[in-house]
């Protein structure tokens, strides 16, 4: 019996933003999925817009596993994690130990594949690691936007700081996402969904489909 995937399912119990007042809690499971979606988007943007040759599916997979060590370590607040080089190094060592502990819960023949996912240690993962890092930051900005929209001003400074850190990466894929996609996260469902004309067109099309089924 191997409990690896059962342990991964516990990601939904690990909440992020422990030092912040949240109007809605966010766990590392949902954060990992959002980061994976964004990492895939950044890779696709790079390929289609900037002539890169990223493996978008690999980027998404790396992002899905990027916080798995926190099942063991918990989510350490960023100000604490990066307070000093000594703490950063110590935490990195603990993360490595956590990964090895999780990997030990797999059959021997699967361990290297999942270790590479969890550490981004594959042969082609170097450039993708940067995309995942950017996607991780963008996901954090999205959380800040959502909290601000809910009237919670505790995330205002975090939003400014993380947004600047993304700009400082000088990553065209991330800059493109921030310009073209991020603003819609501040809209209501009605504003996000469709223009009135497009919405009516969809409604008409869906009615036609259902009418055929019901005949």
PLM segments and residue spans:
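Alpha-helical, largely C-terminal catalytic domains
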Residues: 1-215
